Amino acid sequence: MKQKLLYTLTATMLLSGQAVQAGSLENLERERALTVMEMIDGELSAAERWEKLSAAKRRLADLERIVLSDKKLQGKASQLVQRSFQSFELTFLAHASAEKQRSMQSHWMSEVGLSTDELLSTRVSR
């Protein structure tokens, strides 16, 4: 019994000692995905959505600055890095929408090919 407990404690200590670190780009992608989920969440009221997206815009802008100044990403040939910088308008959502003087929601929707007319012509079904 004691030996089993000792093995369990040793395994737990070894596994918990390995810290998982996400890079700056991965953190940006995670935050951007959460922001897009908030944009399209049908359960939020307009006031709740505005409040959440205002906070998200500040977080995204900070994370985008971190990614743009991250020296580790320069010259890195991973697919994530290449794809992220090729689709600048979607990856760097806060900066791209500010450059075009549009809200993040309208900028994202236009970049993925959705228009107001298309959205208004759809019907909600569950």
Model-based region annotation:
Residues T8-S16:
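Bacterial N-terminal signal peptides
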Residues S24, E31-R32, M39, Q86-R126:
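C-terminal amphipathic alpha-helix
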